[in-house]
């Protein structure tokens, strides 16, 4: 089976292709011009070189099988692998963006886009609040399959080449359980799609022994920790992984995470009615994160089929956030996007193409 050209970093292609400058030319065609056929690159390459590329590599290995659009402008994409027909999902989040014109001080309104990518088909972690785990674990995604999610979404929405995307590894799967492919994808996002690592967030459920490995890669990405509870009993009931990597174990590794000035580790905290949304929980969270440059992102539980949990009131979420902010711990409430199309946090899973989606 031919390798996908999207699986190669710029350095790898530079070593593989002769002369080496061909790699940069090829990257331009792939990531700046969205070319999906080697024959479309004839302006730069000889017929012999194109024949070599066609013999050794393939291009697209996934395709968009279905799209659902939310009333808020967000879109959920169902992708199908062209190799094994398995499916996985990614989400395009559309948000308003305001910038200050440095010359006139005028407020400029625009739009910013975030692509929530998947790194696995299914997930092994088994969080009880997450819909992804109901489908079981199928396989890891290759770097090429991760990259193509953002590439195809950008192309489908006619976003200008120069339009920067934010990338969040918060779709299906645990990024640290597919670390090599995730790290390669980050490098290609940067050198290929020109997405700064500062715009890329890797979210983990807390695979503590792999956090220092990720740190050692020096990728410059943002780290997010899915915490969701303030004591081990509650967290273990929500996230079985906590029995292996408890809260103290995870936080010990987070304290070693290299942070640039003015940067913080993000802690994601899923608020579930009458389970972890009390003011007492907020007080314990404040104590847990003492000494860590952190930001708390509160997420109101997003209901899904078969779930036993309930979504808390916005009022209780605001009380939780107000307490933390008043004590000096930066806390925001994540606006739940795409709830109407089941594309919010914890609602993604593999779907069979023949079922209603």
Swiss-Prot record:
The active site is at 89 (proton acceptor), 345 (s-methylcysteine intermediate). The keyword Transferase applies. Gene3D superfamilies: 1.10.150.530, Aldolase class I. It is found in: Cytoplasm. It comes from the Bacteria. It holds the Pfam family RlmN_N. GO terms for cellular component: cytoplasm. InterPro entries: Aldolase_TIM, Methyltransferase_A, RlmN_N, RNA_MTrfase_RlmN, rRNA_lsu_MTrfase_RlmN/Cfr, rSAM. Its main location: cytoplasm. It is an enzyme of class 2 (transferase). Its cofactor is [4Fe-4S] cluster. Binds 1 [4Fe-4S] cluster. The cluster is coordinated with 3 cysteines and an exchangeable S-adenosyl-L-methionine. Residues 109-340 form the Radical SAM core domain. Its EC number is 2.1.1.192. Keywords: 4Fe-4S, Cytoplasm, Disulfide bond, Iron, Iron-sulfur, Metal-binding, Methyltransferase, rRNA processing, S-adenosyl-L-methionine, Transferase, tRNA processing. It catalyses: adenosine(2503) in 23S rRNA + 2 reduced [2Fe-2S]-[ferredoxin] + 2 S-adenosyl-L-methionine = 2-methyladenosine(2503) in 23S rRNA + 5'-deoxyadenosine + L-methionine + 2 oxidized [2Fe-2S]-[ferredoxin] + S-adenosyl-L-homocysteine; adenosine(37) in tRNA + 2 reduced [2Fe-2S]-[ferredoxin] + 2 S-adenosyl-L-methionine = 2-methyladenosine(37) in tRNA + 5'-deoxyadenosine + L-methionine + 2 oxidized [2Fe-2S]-[ferredoxin] + S-adenosyl-L-homocysteine. GO terms for biological process: rRNA base methylation; tRNA methylation. S-adenosyl-L-methionine binds at residues 173-174, 203, 226-228, 302. Disulfide bonds join 116-345. Belongs to the radical SAM superfamily. RlmN family. Specifically methylates position 2 of adenine 2503 in 23S rRNA and position 2 of adenine 37 in tRNAs. m2A2503 modification seems to play a crucial role in the proofreading step occurring at the peptidyl transferase center and thus would serve to optimize ribosomal fidelity. Reaction proceeds by a ping-pong mechanism involving intermediate methylation of a conserved cysteine residue. PANTHER family: 23S RRNA METHYLTRANSFERASE (PTHR30544), RADICAL SAM CORE DOMAIN-CONTAINING PROTEIN (PTHR30544:SF5). This is Dual-specificity RNA methyltransferase RlmN.
